[in-house]
A protein has these predicted regions:
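Conserved NAD(P)H cofactor-binding loop of Rossmann-fold oxidoreductase domains
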Residues: 74-79
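C-terminal helical subdomain
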Residues: 158, 164-165, 184-225
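Active-site helix of classical SDR
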Residues: 106, 141
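Residue(s) in the substrate-gating loop at a strand-loop-helix junction
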Residues: 125
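Conserved glycine-rich cofactor-binding loop
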Residues: 11-12
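Substrate-binding pocket helix/loop in short-chain dehydrogenase/reductase
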Residues: 82-83, 90-92
Length: 226
């Protein structure tokens, strides 16, 4: 039983697939997203770039559900382009959502996770371990998530489970708003988000004291790994 699982970005992509998987496993998805999720799941709208909004959303959902058993930080945005071409506000928003938003959500959830002996799954990227040009904001944010999560795992050892998920490209709407030159080609091998969500459920399903520390889940021909 996975219990009450708070999922950021749960209205689309990997977050939505994870929410569906949690519900199918008998758990209760609790969604934080700017958009409204389908499926009738409990949700609070919040901009993760705003720390107070993020923290308030976590507390509201946790209190509504009577606690938290896990957190999955699946929300993420991008800003493709050369550093000098991407407006500074847009560049910094990627850091704010992907990295600072992750930290804000986990921080707010920790009192509940300490009580339940729960788990955290952060979502980084293969671009968090291998850098590419025209992706400075995204790489900086996801390299940050990798470092944050590894430090968090050391900090919370024996108290709260921590898993770092490093997914490759997935067939979601994440790429839709990019210029064509930054979109995967028509023959690109991308994972289905449902397959990555099943890996998250595997990590969440481990018994207390047994942890999946890191998971790399990507297509066998993923160009950003290794």
């Amino acid at each position: 039983m996975v219990g009450n699982v708070l999922i950021t970005g749960g209205a689309s992509g990997l977050g939505r697939a994870t929410a569906t998987a949690v519900a199918k496993a008998g758990g209760r998805p609790l969604i934080v997203d700017l958009g409204e999720p389908d499926g009738g799941f409990d949700h609070v709208r919040a901009d993760l770039a705003d720390r107070e909004q993020a923290e308030r959303a976590v507390r509201e959902l946790a209190e509504r559900a009577g606690g938290l058993d896990a957190v999955v930080t699946a929300a993420g945005i991008d800003a493709c382009g050369r550093l000098e071409d991407v407006p500074a506000d847009r560049w910094e928003r990627v850091i704010a959502v992907n990295l600072l938003g992750t930290a804000a959500v986990v921080r707010a959830a920790l009192p509940y996770l300490h009580r339940s002996g729960g788990k955290v799954v952060t979502v980084a990227s293969t671009l968090g371990v291998r850098a590419f040009g025209d992706a400075t904001a995204y790489c900086a944010s996801k390299f940050g998530v990798v470092g944050f999560t590894r430090a968090l795992a050391a900090e919370l050892a024996g108290q709260v489970g921590v898993t770092l998920l490093i997914p490759g490209g997935m067939r979601t709407a994440f790429f839709d708003d990019r210029p064509d030159r930054y979109k995967p080609g028509p023959d690109a091998r991308l994972n289905q988000p449902e397959d990555v969500a099943s890996a998250i459920l595997f990590a969440l399903g481990q018994p207390r004291g047994c942890e999946v520390r890191e998971l790399v889940v990507c297509a066998s021909t993923e160009t950003s790994w290794p």
